[in-house]
Amino acid sequence: MAFDKDAFLTALDSMTVMELNDLVKAIEEKFGVSAAAMSAPAAGGAVAAVAEEKTEFNVVLLEAGAAKVSVIKAVREITGLGLKEAKDMVDGAPKNVKEGVSKVDAEAALKKLLDAGAKAELK
């Protein structure tokens, strides 16, 4: 079986976050591994602390604003939820729309919400 790494990476690049999540779960089940990060043992002595840049962000919907229907559509597009679930999320604001996503994905989701007329922020 020929393996084309570039084709594989292209396929991964075209997948949605939900599809990638399903892929990770399938790989964990198939090979009996976990995608959880391994923690390194504590270092002894005086080691300078390195300030780490935040890599995971939450997109928080603060309120729907005047354009509630547009915000519900944006939430559905971002999360893949059904109409009722998206409406419940918007009605229950403040709510996390996306959790633990990369900065690029979080900024894209935030832009969609703001463009729809919602008040939202990154945490």
From Swiss-Prot:
Forms part of the ribosomal stalk which helps the ribosome interact with GTP-bound translation factors. Is thus essential for accurate translation. GO terms for biological process: translation. GO terms for cellular component: cytosolic large ribosomal subunit. The gene is rplL. It comes from Albidiferax ferrireducens (strain ATCC BAA-621 / DSM 15236 / T118) (Rhodoferax ferrireducens). Homodimer. Part of the ribosomal stalk of the 50S ribosomal subunit. Forms a multimeric L10(L12)X complex, where L10 forms an elongated spine to which 2 to 4 L12 dimers bind in a sequential fashion. Binds GTP-bound translation factors. Keywords: Ribonucleoprotein, Ribosomal protein. This is Large ribosomal subunit protein bL12. Belongs to the bacterial ribosomal protein bL12 family. One of its GO terms (molecular function) is mRNA binding. InterPro entries: Ribosomal_bL12 (IPR000206), Ribosomal_bL12_C (IPR013823), Ribosomal_bL12_C/ClpS-like (IPR014719), Ribosomal_bL12_oligo (IPR008932), Ribosomal_bL12_oligo_N_sf (IPR036235).
